[in-house]
Every structure is written in structure tokens, then in C-alpha cells.
Swiss-Prot record:
Signal peptide: none annotated. It catalyses: [protein-PII]-L-tyrosine + UTP = [protein-PII]-uridylyl-L-tyrosine + diphosphate; [protein-PII]-uridylyl-L-tyrosine + H2O = [protein-PII]-L-tyrosine + UMP + H(+). PROSITE patterns: ACT, HD. Residues 1-341 are annotated as: Uridylyltransferase. Has four distinct domains: an N-terminal nucleotidyltransferase (NT) domain responsible for UTase activity, a central HD domain that encodes UR activity, and two C-terminal ACT domains that seem to have a role in glutamine sensing. Residues 705-783, 815-891 form the ACT domain. It comes from Pseudomonas savastanoi pv. phaseolicola (strain 1448A / Race 6) (Pseudomonas syringae pv. phaseolicola (strain 1448A / Race 6)). Its cofactor is Mg(2+). The gene is glnD. One of its GO terms (biological process) is regulation of nitrogen utilization. Residues 342-704 are annotated as: Uridylyl-removing. Modifies, by uridylylation and deuridylylation, the PII regulatory proteins (GlnB and homologs), in response to the nitrogen status of the cell that GlnD senses through the glutamine level. Under low glutamine levels, catalyzes the conversion of the PII proteins and UTP to PII-UMP and PPi, while under higher glutamine levels, GlnD hydrolyzes PII-UMP to PII and UMP (deuridylylation). Thus, controls uridylylation state and activity of the PII proteins, and plays an important role in the regulation of nitrogen assimilation and metabolism. This is Bifunctional uridylyltransferase/uridylyl-removing enzyme. Keywords: Hydrolase, Magnesium, Multifunctional enzyme, Nucleotidyltransferase, Repeat, Transferase.
């Protein structure tokens, strides 16, 4: 800390100002304001961050000493003011906690009660927010013994004012001789760390990470230092290196990583104007700018900054693992067990694998891959001993092109993917210890690569490893209940290692610009060649990487009731083996991208596409389903259900004659029977018919189906979606049919706000039925579009809406494709625009992916003809862009093909 820094705090000038004023408060406030401005300017000008946070602690020391001196403490008063916690370490960010301990010799606080209260009131009045406790030396011992947080705080203390001997007595009575011996302290701190990591989903890669508490954050470094302090009395990284726990290079890496996080935290506090340790979207862009990051052709400044952040915390996590493992071996192990040999290079020691000698990786570099294969083959191995982790770090520079092309290494790497257990766990270890990104440089490029959106909630490398984890979990019984089809298929894949390898490469092309699927396919081809895979295996992996998005896109954006869509997709996959691999990869990809994306409706779409495609392949691609044949089958099966329930077939025939082919193509026989039975029982003047099908019989069946039958009216869609918006329903699919008798038969698939179906909640079902019926009975009372606040996260991912309009070559409709930021009431707004432009909606596919929607609308003009006027299309596009823009930049993307 500085001894004198008059620019930050001029003691003489401050004392003079105190003497001139009747009240000291104004002088203190002025000094605090000035110091804040000086420190902020120093940060912006690039001042060394360590000096900066020490400067702030020094300034607060001076302010507290001056405040303490405002009161009459006798020279021999047994009372002292101590800094504890982070402030005790001499580290203060702009809004860090200023933790104080007022330490007394006697348990009787009464004699000092009044001056202490006046002192704390002064601190409050001058705007210094402190956390304080008042304890005697004995009380420190009592509370420290009972509370891990208290003993941790007391270990980091400095005397600000008053006699130093009180602090020394406090340290003596709270030492390891009296409480919290190093073993007990380490176990408690390690458990505390695990609990904290679990709170942040055990990942360094959260979208809005906590700079202090997330895995790899500042708290992990502090945990290392606390344990070292309890064991050795050292309280900084340099001293820890002196104890042999850190190499010089490791000490330098930890120190530079800590300083980077300090910069981020300082900037966070400065921008937020409060104590804020969450790296929120609100601040990420501005911090990237403050720290000097700029946009490039391939990456935004924020992506470059966040990649740096994730790589830093990953380095901290790696070193934390090493040091904690070292502590565990030194503090906990009795070292009584004998090592059990695994082979000439490795042995098992206390359940952990270790190299048999320090030269193993130097003499046999292939052992850097072998160690992970051995752990996968022996799942009882708990992990890697600290010295061996360090040896891996020291020798990983040997991984060069010769290493990558060595048949021993390529064979071992493929062997890992053939193991029955431990594939994901050991790939994560390889990534954590920096081996994976060196062995596969293309993987190294995606480490810490964040995509700046809400759709992808993990970095590319974390998502990739999560995907492999999901593939592996499909073999677990508890997971197979949620993913029955994917689990069944996974179990019968002829070569499961190929799906893992495809998963490893599916997103590896991201962050380079261009089509990541094509770039990844090129890398996958090179991987197959280098690893001497059979041609068929390589071709399958390359095909999967190149086309890993096709099944999801088809399921969510195409009409799966159209036989031509199924036939085209069946032709694309070619055979059941490719279909099986692609389905399993798609399911794992969606679940590994963002757990909230996987809902019952998306699951049912993929299942339907898989099942229908499999039927088409077994029937033979040369025998596609004829539209008339499908209609005939649906009608026959539906009529059989109705007749068995006592319905007059003549009534059915009369009803069906007005419905048209599309209705029977888009609905199952069961749905046709359900609709027909209700329609035929509906009184002529009964108003709108609203049917709601509950789906709780099968937990993962899909969304809730709402069927509406009523006389057609121009604003029917607009009124319906506005009413559903008011009912807090999320629409995922819409099928709009108008009969020749001018009745509309609309089917909506909806989910609740939690992504589930409505289920067997009679009150909720009745609320929906009543709300829709009332709105459709009184269409003139157009439901008001609810003006909900746009969620904070969505505001930071706003982009200009993109609208593509073209006519369908096979059907007499115009296709309007919308890519836009999500916002409350979006569909209701679209419906209002269609109403204003006198358009009829024939069909819709709705998909919400994170912060964006990807919707497809099939529309016609009022005469049921495709749109043909480019000017009208341009006006329509402008209206949509204007209505849906959310904090987006000016301009939009329009492609019209009429």
C-alpha cells in the first residue's frame, strides 16, 4: 500500500478542512467523492489493477482512522478497529464490502457502547457502507470456533486504529492449536467450495457468470489462500510458491488471471454503481470496450472479451484442481497405502492415478493420451494426483504435428471413444488439463468461444462436451424414461463411437466466420483420415457434422403432415442407419444447447418425423405415399371410430364433404373423429366450439391441442392469438383450415409459460375455453395486446427483424419467414398486422429459440390467392419490422421473391 498519495488523499489538507468546519461530515464526503473520481480515472487510464485496489484500501484506512480520531479514546483504552475479510487483505474494489471488527479486551461492551454507536453513525452519515461486528477477544474465539465464515474473516485482519496487541491475542486464541486444525478447516472449505460450485451448475461457462463465486472465480483463489494460511501461515500466491505448492509459471498464471478478474470486477462495480459481481449482459459490451476489445470480421468485441474471460477462469479452475488435490494429499493422506501398479508407466495411489516416475511423459509422450484411456477403462480411479497433473502441464508442449500423427496416439484416442464408461468425464479432464485443445487444434479454437445469444447458454466447447454427456446418459435407465425412443436407438447403434465423434465435431467450425457445418465437415474428414478410420465411418461422421441441423429444422419449420415433406426427408437420409444416428445426435444437441429448449412439443415433432420417415424408408423410396391414399386411410379409420360410437355415417359424410383435402392430411384419424363428434353435437346457434385435449396420459406426449370451430370471420386469427396471449399461452403450432361452408377449423398446439402442456387442470382448461369463447363471440371487442415489459436479457440481444417472402412452388400460398427478437405478445402483433393487410393465414410453424423466434406463416390474400404485388409485400415487411423491433439497430433484411 502507498505511504503517501496526496492526489488520492492529502492528510494535511483534509485536517485543515476539518478544522474549518463545525461538522466533519462535509469534509469526509468531499474526500470520498474526490477519491472515487481519482480512482476511476486511474482505472480508465490503465493503472495497474493491484495498485488500484490497494490504493482504495489505503484511502479507506485513512478515512477510518480520521473518523476514529473524532472520538475521545484514552491512550490505554483496550479497544481496536480492525479490517477483516477482503478489506483485511488490503483489497478493495469500488463497492466491495468494508468489513470491520471492533475488538475489545473485555466481554463488557457497555463502557464503549456510546462512542462505538457514534462512530458507526458517523460512517453512515458520510456515506461509507460498512459491515461491522463488535466482539471481545473471548467472543472471537467462541464465534470463530462455531462458524467457518467468522474464523475465515478473522484470519485476514489488520489493525486500523488502536493497540495491535489485541489483534495478536485474538489470532493466538483462534489459532489451529485451539480450533479449526488444518485438516478440519480444509475439509470444511472444500465442502463449501463444492456447494458453491453446484450453485453455479458446476460450470465456469454460465452466460452471466459471477466473477467472484462461479467456478474458476476469485473465490477459488481465495479458498486456496485460506487453506494455505491455516496450514502454513502464508497468505499470498508468492509465499505459496515458496512452500513448493506452485511452480513459478503457475504462480505467474494465477497472478495474471487474478488481475484480469480484478479488472473485470472493478469495471463491474464502476459501471453498476453498486456492489455487483454478476457479469450481466447489461455490462458485458461496455466492459469489453473499457478493456480495449474491438470487433473483428469473425468475432464481436464482446465474444473476444468473454472468450478471454472463460479461458482465464478455466485456467484458474485447472490450477485450483491441482492445488486442492495437493492439499488433499498433504493434509489428509496418511500415506500408509502402497502404490498398485497399472502398467510400467502408471500406478494407483490412494485411488488416484499417478506416473511411476517424473520422466514418463518425456520418454513416452503417448502416455499423455493413455492416462485418460486408463481412467475410462478403470472407473474406480478417482482422478489424477497433483504431481502427475503438473507433469501433464509441463510436458503438453510435446504435443505437435508428429505427436498428432503418431499411430499410437491416434489409436489411443479412438480407443477412448470405444470405452463403455467415462468418455465424457475424461474428455472433460483432457479439456481441463489443456490436452484436448492441443491434440485437436480445431477444438482448441472453440475453447471459451461464447455465442452472444440466449439460445446457446454454454461456450462451444462446454456445449460439445455436454452433448457427449447427453449421448452417454441415454444409456441410463432414469434417462431412458424421458427419452425412450432416443435411448432405444442409442442402444442399437452399430458403432456408438461414431456418434460421439460426430458430436465432438458438430460445432467445431464455429467462431471462424462462414457455415460452421461445412467447416466442421472439412475438419471431420481430416480427423477420419488422420485416425485411419474406415471410409464408411468417416463418411458417416462427415455427413452427420454437415447435416446436424437438418432434422431439427425440418421438424420445426416444415409441415410434417405433408407426405411430400416426409418423402423428401427420407430421400435425404437415404437409409435407417443414417436416420438413427441423426435422430440421436439431434436430441442430444438440443438438450446440450439449452435445457429449456427441450419441451414435450419439440420432442413430439422429432418423434413424428423419425417415425414417418422410417415408415417411408421401409415402404421404399420408390413407393411414396399418395395424398389421396393418405386421405382415404385417415377417413376410413376416423369413420370406424365414429360409427362404433353411434354416429350416423350420413351426417359424417355431409360434414366431411365441406372440409377439403388439407384438413385430412393435417390431422390424425383420432383427431378427425374427436373434432367430427363434437361438431355434429354442437347446436346450430351454439357459438364457437372450443375443444381442449389434455395430454397427461403420456408425460412426454407433446403440447396441449386447442381446436376451434366457428363461422369464418376476417379477424379470426388475430382475435384468437390475442386472446391466447392474454391467457398466457405460448403457441407452438397453428393449422388453419376454412371449409367450403365458410367455417374455420383451427388447431393450435400450446404450452404454458413453463414449457409444459396444460395437463389435467380442470380450472385452467375451463378458463381457457371461456376466454377463447368470449373473445370469438365478440370479435368487435378486439382483445388488447398486453403490454408486458421486455425481459432484461432480451433487450441485450435485440437485432433487426428479418422477413423473407416467397411463393410456394407446390402449393397456392405465399410463405412468410420471420426471424426476429422474441418479445411478449409477438404472435398477437403479427395477427393484428395480417388483419390490417387483409390477409388470411392458412398455416403456421412457430419456433422460439432463446432470444429469437423463427416462425413460418403460410398466407393468402382475401381471395385465397398467393400474394403477387411486390409493393404490398414490401409494405407488409415494413409493418412487421416496425412492430417487432426491440432496441435494434436501424435497418432490416428483406428478401421478396414473388
Amino acid at each position: 500500500m502507498p505511504q503517501v498519495d496526496p492526489d488520492l488523499f492529502d492528510r494535511g489538507q483534509f485536517q485543515a478542512e476539518l478544522a474549518l468546519k463545525a461538522s466533519p461530515i462535509a469534509a469526509f464526503k468531499k474526500a470520498i467523492r474526490r477519491a472515487k473520481d481519482v480512482l476511476d480515472d486511474r482505472f480508465k487510464s490503465g493503472r495497474d489493477i493491484r495498485r488500484l485496489i490497494e490504493d482504495r484500501a489505503w484511502f479507506v484506512d485513512n478515512i477510518l482512522q480520521k473518523a476514529w480520531d473524532q472520538f475521545e479514546w484514552s491512550e490505554d483504552a483496550d479497544i481496536a478497529l480492525l479490517a477483516v475479510g477482503g478489506y483485511g487483505r488490503g483489497e478493495l474494489h469500488p463497492y466491495s464490502d468494508i468489513d470491520l471488527l471492533i475488538l475489545l479486551d473485555s466481554d463488557d461492551h457497555e463502557v464503549f457502547r456510546e462512542p462505538i454507536e457514534r462512530f458507526l453513525t458517523l460512517l453512515w452519515d458520510i456515506g461509507l457502507e460498512v459491515g461491522q461486528s463488535v466482539r471481545s477477544v473471548n467472543e472471537c474465539a467462541q464465534e470463530g470456533r462455531a462458524d467457518l465464515t467468522v474464523i475465515t474473516n478473522l484470519m485476514e485482519s489488520r489493525t486500523i486504529a488502536g493497540p495491535e496487541h489485541l489483534r495478536q491475542r485474538m489470532l493466538e486464541v483462534t489459532s489451529t492449536e485451539h480450533m479449526w486444525p488444518s485438516k478440519e478447516f480444509f475439509l470444511a472449505k472444500h465442502a463449501e467450495q463444492k456447494k458453491r460450485h453446484h450453485k453455479y451448475n458446476d460450470t465456469e461457462y454460465n452466460l452471466e457468470p459471477n466473477v467472484k463465486g462461479s467456478p474458476g472465480g476469485l473465490r477459488d483463489i481465495q479458498t486456496i489462500l485460506w487453506v494455505a494460511r491455516r496450514q502454513y501461515g502464508t497468505l499470498n500466491l508468492h509465499a505459496l510458491a515458496g512452500e513448493g505448492f506452485l511452480l513459478g509459471s503457475e504462480n505467474a498464471l494465477l497472478a495474471s488471471s487474478q488481475e484480469f478478474l480484478w479488472k473485470v470486477r472493478y469495471a463491474l462495480h464502476m459501471l453498476a454503481g453498486r456492489s455487483e459481481d454478476r457479469l450481466l449482459f447489461d455490462y458485458q459490451v461496455r466492459i469489453a470496450g473499457l478493456l480495449g476489445y474491438e470487433d473483428s470480421d469473425a468475432k464481436l468485441a464482446i465474444e473476444r472479451f468473454m472468450q478471454k474471460y472463460y479461458r482465464v477462469v478455466m485456467s484458474i479452475a485447472e490450477l485450483s484442481d491441482l492445488i486442492i488435490q495437493h492439499f488433499e494429499e498433504v493434509i489428509l493422506s496418511d500415506d500408509s497405502g502402497t502404490a498398485q501398479p497399472i502398467n510400467s508407466r502408471f500406478q494407483l495411489h490412494d485411488g488416484y492415478i499417478e506416473a511411476t516416475n517424473p520422466n514418463v511423459f518425456k520418454r513416452t509422450p503417448f502416455a499423455m493420451i493413455e492416462i485418460f484411456v486408463l481412467m475410462a477403462q478403470h472407473p474406480e480411479i478417482k482422478g489424477v494426483r497433483a504431481d502427475t497433473i503438473r507433469l501433464l502441464r509441463e510436458h503438453r508442449h510435446l504435443i505437435n504435428d508428429d505427436f498428432r500423427n503418431d499411430i499410437r496416439n491416434t489409436s489411443l484416442f479412438i480407443e477412448l471413444f470405444k470405452c463403455e464408461t467415462g468418455i465424457h468425464r475424461n474428455l472433460r479432464r483432457m479439456n481441463r488439463y489443456g490436452i484436448l485443445g492441443l491434440y485437436l487444434p480445431e477444438f482448441g479454437h472453440i475453447v471459451g468461444q461464447m455465442q452472444h445469444d440466449l439460445f446457446h447458454i454454454y461456450t462451444v466447447d462446454a456445449h460439445t462436451l455436454n452433448l457427449i454427456k447427453h449421448l452417454r446418459k441415454l444409456q441410463y435407465t432414469e434417462v431412458s424414461e424421458k427419452f425412450p425412443l432416443a435411448s432405444k436407438i442409442m442402444a442399437r447403434l452399430p458403432k456408438p463411437e461414431l456418434i460421439y465423434l460426430a458430436g465432438l465435431y458438430h460445432d467445431i467450425g464455429k467462431g471462424r466466420g462462414g457455415d460452421h457445418s461445412e467447416l466442421g465437415a472439412i475438419d471431420a474428414q481430416a480427423f477420419g483420415t488422420r485416425h485411419h478410420l474406415p471410409d464408411w465411418d468417416t463418411r458417416l461422421i462427415v455427413w452427420l457434422v454437415s447435416n446436424h441441423l437438418v432434422m431439427s429444422t425440418t421438424a420445426q419449420r416444415k409441415d410434417l403432415s405433408d407426405p411430400q415433406v416426409i418423402h423428401d426427408f427420407a430421400q435425404f437420409v437415404g437409409d435407417e442407419v443414417h436416420l438413427d444416428y441423426l435422430y440421436v445426435l439431434t436430441v442430444a444437441d438440443i438438450n446440450a444447447t439449452n435445457p429449456t429448449l427441450w419441451n414435450s412439443w419439440r420432442a413430439s415433432l422429432l418423434r413424428q418425423l423419425y417415425t414417418e420417415t422410417k415408415r417411408a424408408l421401409r415402404r421404399g423410396l420408390e413407393n411414396p405415399v399418395d395424398r389421396e391414399e393418405q386421405i382415404r386411410r385417415t377417413q376410413t379409420a376416423a369413420l370406424d371410430i365414429l360409427v362404433r360410437n353411434g354416429t350416423d355415417p350420413d351426417d359424417v359424410e355431409q360434414l366431411w364433404s365441406a372440409l377439403g383435402d388439407d384438413y385430412f392430411l393435417r390431422h390424425t384419424a383420432g383427431d378427425v373423429a374427436w373434432h367430427s363428434d363434437a361438431i355434429l353435437q354442437q347446436p346450430a346457434d351454439g357459438g364457437p366450439l372450443v375443444l381442449i385435449k389434455e395430454t397427461t396420459q403420456r408425460e412426454f406426449e407433446g403440447g396441449t391441442q386447442i381446436f376451434i370451430y366457428a363461422p369464418d370471420q376476417h379477424d379470426f386469427f388475430a382475435v384468437t392469438v390475442a386472446a391466447m396471449d392474454q391467457l398466457n399461452l405460448n403457441i407452438h403450432d397453428a393449422r388453419i383450415i376454412t371449409s367450403s361452408s365458410k367455417f374455420t377449423l383451427d388447431t393450435y398446439i400450446v404450452l404454458d409459460n413453463e414449457g409444459g402442456s396444460i395437463g389435467d387442470n380442470p380450472e385452467r382448461v375451463q378458463e381457457i375455453r371461456n376466454g377463447l369463447t368470449e373473445a370469438l363471440r365478440n370479435p368487435d371487442d378486439y382483445p388488447t395486446i398486453i403490454k408486458r415489459r421486455v425481459p432484461r436479457q432480451l433487450k441485450h440481444f435485440a437485432f433487426a427483424p428479418q422477413v423473407t417472402i416467397h411463393n410456394d412452388a407446390q402449393r397456392p400460398v405465399t410463405v412468410l419467414e420471420l426471424l426476429a427478437p422474441d418479445r411478449p405478445g409477438l404472435l398477437a402483433r403479427i395477427g393484428k398486422i395480417f388483419l390490417e393487410f387483409d390477409l388470411s393465414l392458412q398455416n403456421a410453424k412457430i419456433a422460439t429459440l432463446g432470444e429469437r423466434v423463427e416462425d413460418v406463416f403460410f398466407i393468402t390474400d382475401a381471395n385465397n390467392h398467393p400474394l403477387s404485388d411486390p409493393q404490398l409485400c414490401s409494405q407488409l415487411q415494413d409493418a412487421i419490422v416496425k412492430q417487432l423491433s426491440v432496441n435494434s439497430e436501424p435497418g432490416h433484411d428483406l428478401r421478396i421473391s414473388i
